[in-house]
Amino acid sequence: MRLLLFNLATDVNDPVLAFALAWVRRLAPHCEYIDIITMYRGDADLPANVTVYSAGRERGLSKPRRVANFYRHLLRLMATRRYDACFAHMMPLFAGMAGPLLSARGIRTVLWYTHRQRSRQLRLGMAMSWRVVSADATSFPYETDKLRVIGHGIDTDFYAPAAPADWGDTLVVQVGRLAAIKHQATTIQAVAGTAGELALIGGAQAGSASGYEEMLKERAGQVGMNQRCRFTGDLPAAAVRDWYRRATVAVNMSPVGLFDKAALESMACGVPTIVCNPAFAPLLGERADLLLTAGPDDVAGLRDRLERLFALPPEERAAIGRRLRNGVLREHSLDGLSERLLAVLRTGELPESPHSRRSMST
């Protein structure tokens, strides 16, 4: 396959988007070449058959200059290369901008989008795409016959269990940007009613409303968590993984519509993970009562589940973690995602295999 790929950032140091480099590395052996047009180019160790072209955000270029650079790269590549497909990763903007040119050449676009946010930009990108792929049926905000559900792609070799550090039995970890939609305030209040310590991993998103981090710190003080709550800021992936490995319990309060890969990363590390999004229920199995709360504001329910998990013998918590990891391996591994994505790029449909997730597609 000869693949054109659009993404928002190609940078191993990006705290949110660096994971997508693992997708590129896994796709590369199946492709003659991959050409990436990205909004932001940073450091990236990629295979020899992958070439990156940037619109120039890393150089501080204005929007009009970035638009001009995008079309300059696209037109030159279309004049000198042949493509079998285009994959737009969280880039409905580029999918929409390139759509007429690609369609005229018979190049079909597959758009990956996993967020509940609706926008005119997304509608245009969807209109210009042959297929849309998302992690879960609930993680794409529009109903469309174009949607194919392919799961997340978690690097389960990287996110894997290790012998835990001696942090006792009450360390709670929540990973995600500091934002109201992630409901860190719920976790702070819930942990405050237990003997646990809390680590909030992640910083405020650039351009987000100011003051949320300060509000969280104030809330921690109000409930007596000043000495038991750490704010680490943004960390590289290896450091995030190390926090997962130290954790007794991981928490993810992302609501319906946000099928958050951070919850899958902690599960892949073998950590009992409490969630509030029922889309995760198939992974929780018989322990759903212990790992699924009523919603992102359910402080009492989260506190109850934390206390019950803290009270379990370490061996039982480890057994829960193993079952969660096995579910991620089965449904959301990088190999499985690569197989499903390549099938959609080639045929528009999921593969006929145990990895197909056909029961969740629309």
Where are these regions (language model features)?
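Short alpha-helical donor nucleotide-sugar binding micro-motif in glycosyltransferases
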Residues: D234, D242-A247
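Aromatic "clamp/platform" in nucleotide-sugar-dependent glycosyltransferases that forms part
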Residues: P255
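Short, structured helix-loop element that forms part of the nucleotide-activated donor/catalytic region
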Residues: A44-L46, A199-Q227, A238-A239, W243
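A conserved mid-protein helix/loop that constitutes part of the nucleotide-sugar donor-binding site
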Residues: A18-R25, A179-G193, G211-E214
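Conserved donor-binding/catalytic core segment of Leloir-type glycosyltransferases
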Residues: L4, A165-K182, T187-I201
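Conserved acidic donor-binding segment of nucleotide-sugar-dependent glycosyltransferases
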Residues: R287-A300, E307-P314
